[in-house]
């Protein structure tokens, strides 16, 4: 990683998220934004951990119930507790995982974490360029795209404005993965009935960063998944997706897993 690649003056979603989770891989500018957002929404950290719980449930279900042993985690962020490879390999020691993030700090720490694991790696790439991501030699060294793979887009697509055409991005990954593969995503729910404190948090976040935060409704998400079979219970609030504990209702996000026939 080249130090010139690291912008310490611009907040990064990956590093802000790391700060909220209590991590140390962040800078003063990230902590300042994260602190103001958390002050606007005191329950924010609990909601962030609830999102991690959703990711864990998805990976566990895919590995144990649906037989998936390959995972591609897009916008994976800074490594923290409950990483995909830890959850997947606990269910199936042969599971293989590739992480993708654009943030050089996230990638550097991911590579350090995975240095001794030949079944997992991290790639610095832009998830908005599916053809580039899927053609990377490093990815091909870990994943066999001729076999089913689970593509994870957890809490990342709401950072993409409509100008980035997130639906087209999702469909591009769909078209390039093998039959029997899965797409899993979570996304901030539409803001028509948003809790007041979450609305304040998002307003504070958007004032402080250059990164958008877009709410979208379930019908739009469903359109992104055309041609796929939704795994029951379909598109629901994440706390309702195969809950195995008291799931948080604080942060309104929808989640879904879909299979490519």
Language model feature labels by segment:
Residues 211-235:
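Short alpha-helix
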Residues 1-125, 129-131, 135-143:
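Rossmann-like AdoMet
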Residues 234-236, 240-261:
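Core SAM-dependent methyltransferase catalytic element
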Residues 149-153, 169-170, 176-188:
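Conserved beta-strand signature within the Rossmann-like core of class I S-adenosyl-L-methionine
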Residues 130-134, 159-172:
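A short, conserved alpha-helix within the catalytic core of class I
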Residues 125, 148-157:
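Residues lining the SAM
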Residues 128, 157-159, 188-193:
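Short "lid" loop at the C-terminus of a central beta-strand within the Rossmann-like core
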Residues 197-217:
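Conserved Class I S-adenosyl-L-methionine
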